[in-house]
UniProtKB/Swiss-Prot annotation:
This is Acetyl-coenzyme A carboxylase carboxyl transferase subunit beta. Component of the acetyl coenzyme A carboxylase (ACC) complex. Biotin carboxylase (BC) catalyzes the carboxylation of biotin on its carrier protein (BCCP) and then the CO(2) group is transferred by the transcarboxylase to acetyl-CoA to form malonyl-CoA. SUPFAM superfamilies: ClpP/crotonase. Pathway: Lipid metabolism; malonyl-CoA biosynthesis; malonyl-CoA from acetyl-CoA: step 1/1. Zn(2+) binds at C38, C41, C56, C59. HAMAP family: AcetylCoA_CT_beta. Belongs to the AccD/PCCB family. Its EC number is 2.1.3.15. It is found in: Cytoplasm. The gene is accD. One of its GO terms (molecular function) is zinc ion binding. The keyword Cell membrane does not apply. GO terms for cellular component: acetyl-CoA carboxylase complex.
């Protein structure tokens, strides 16, 4: 009877010994540079879908971008003239491993230091421009960063130019000790001289802007803009919670929180910053 028919045996498959070895020989690998994981929504994104502005298509998170990428998004093509490239740190404290760290940062970013400075045109408005790059030792402010920004303000005074700075920093550069902290006062004094000359100063806070940069020139602009969801603060969240012994709001130190409390004038989408900068510079009688 069919009910008691002997079951057929399973098909036997002889393993292919040629496939033995590393997994990479069997499973094709997807190159890491093709995809990026959004830190906010955790989605995996095909990098080409981020566009030049590097904005997550799912949650609109703004990825951190380099100074060169920021330059491309902001200024008129071919208008940027880089300045003060010959200034280099002398490692005043002979801090162990500092020179090696500097060299690696230079090779990785293609920059001489953590800030790119120069003159440029934004929709035919001439400006003195500084762009900080968090990929260079977290854009920490040392003597060279302070000197370059100070010289930029001095040049702007001489040439009657508005100053526009895109800030991003982890704070003062610990490898240079007290000399890095002195840059806060040094740059702030230059900002004051520029203001006394009746010239316009615009700051755009990007993620992250913290420490001594926040406590000095980042918050001294005549108008202060910020990119959405940028981290902006002085001390770290855990330090503050330990000090005040209170739990802080989830959005504490976010750009939107600062705007709600009067520290930021406006939150501007990255794709709209070029137009906004040009409009504000022109409105305040900026460079022609």
């Amino acid at each position: 009877m069919a009910l008691f028919r002997k079951k057929d045996k399973y098909i036997r498959i002889t393993p292919n010994n040629s496939l033995k070895g590393s997994v990479s020989q069997v499973i094709p690998e997807v190159p890491d540079e093709l995809f990026a994981k959004c830190p906010a929504c955790k989605h995996m994104i095909y990098k080409k879908d981020l566009g030049l502005a590097k904005i997550c298509p799912t949650c609109s998170y703004n990825f951190r971008i380099s100074a060169q990428e920021r330059l491309t998004l902001t200024v008129d093509e071919g208008s940027f003239q880089e300045l003060f490239t010959s200034i280099e740190t002398k490692d005043p404290l002979r801090f162990p491993g500092y020179q090696e760290k500097l060299q690696k940062a230079k090779e990785t970013t293609g920059l001489h230091e953590a800030v790119l400075t120069g003159k440029a045109m934004v929709k035919e408005q001439k400006i003195a421009l500084a762009i900080m790059d968090s990929h260079f030792i977290m854009a920490s402010m040392g003597t060279v960063v302070g000197e370059k920004i100070t010289r930029l303000f001095e040049l702007a005074i001489e040439e009657n130019l508005p100053v526009v700075i895109f800030t991003a920093s982890g704070g003062a550069r610990m490898q240079e000790g007290i000399m890095s902290l002195m840059q806060m006062a040094k740059v702030s004094a230059a900002v004051k001289r520029h203001s006394n000359a009746g010239l316009f100063y615009l700051t755009i806070l990007t993620d992250p802007t913290t420490g001594g940069v926040t406590a000095s020139f980042a918050m001294e602009g005549d108008i202060i803009l910020a990119e959405p969801q940028s981290l902006v603060g002085f001390a770290g969240r855990r330090v503050i919670e330990t000090t005040v012994r209170e739990n802080l709001p989830d959005d504490f130190q976010k750009a939107e929180f600062l705007q709600d409390h009067g520290f930021v004038d406006a939150i501007v989408k990255r794709t709209e910053l070029r137009d906004k900068v040009a409009h504000l510079v022109a409105f305040h009688g900026g460079g022609q």
